[in-house]
Amino acid sequence: MDCDIYGPSVPLMMGIREKPEISSAQKMIPLTSHGVKLMSMGFLLPGDEPVIWRGPMLMRTIQQFVMDVDWGKLDILLVDLPPGTGDAQLSLCQTVPLDGGVIVTTPQEASLGVVRKGIGMFEKVNVPILGIVENMSYFTAPNGDRVEIFGHGGGAKEAQNQGTPFLGEIPIFVEIREGGDSGVPVVVHDQESPPALAFSNLANKLREILL
């Protein structure tokens, strides 16, 4: 469920641009791509039309995504949220009981400061933190050197400080960007590639925590 209402990217990254149909119960039927049920504001707007809404409209949309979509039986409902502690986060927490939040950061302090605010917000609304993921941890240069553009270990250190699991690093891979642009995620295109394994390891850790 894509709750980045102002900047939805799920349609592009999952390679699907259709509009959802309406069921006999007057609920939207989520679209499916690569075996995943999806709902996004990007399915409801033409092209690159912007969403220019105040908070109450955003809140109602998120409520509709939860209550007026025929999700059926799910293993896990994964919600993509924008950065920060704004209306999207608060609306979601007020609409549905959450098993927990996964915090995504980059290694540098500028990002970690925002992360601490996010953790504090979830704590205030009684949503447990399932773990921290460090994105864009490093890239491997053509000569094989590991280059840490944004510093090293910030996510792991913050997880230790917060007393929450560190779920892993996602390095910078060209394949991740290419998969997102083409609508074929790297975990679908080549399941045994290093970038796919980075995501698979993260998913397995999260599944062990939840199930």
Question: Model-derived features: where do they sit?
Answer:
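Hydrophobic residues in beta-strands of the RecA-like P-loop NTPase core, especially within AAA+ ATPase
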Residues: M1, L78-V79, V133
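Glycine-rich phosphate-binding loops of nucleotide-dependent enzymes
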Residues: M39, I62, L81, Q94, ...
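Conserved Switch II/interswitch segment of TRAFAC-class P-loop GTPases
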Residues: G72-V79, T85-G86, P97-G118
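Phosphate-binding/switch loop-helix module in NTP-utilizing enzymes
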Residues: L44-L92
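Phosphate-binding loop that captures ATP/GTP phosphates
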Residues: M1-D48, W53, M59, V66
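C-terminal lobe/tail of nucleotide-utilizing enzymes
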Residues: I119-L211
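Conserved beta-strand segments of the P-loop GTPase G domain that flank and frequently precede/overlap
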Residues: S40, I103-T106, I132-V133
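Conserved nucleotide-binding/hydrolysis micro-motifs of P-loop NTPases
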Residues: I5-G7, L44-D48, P83-G84, P107-S111, ...
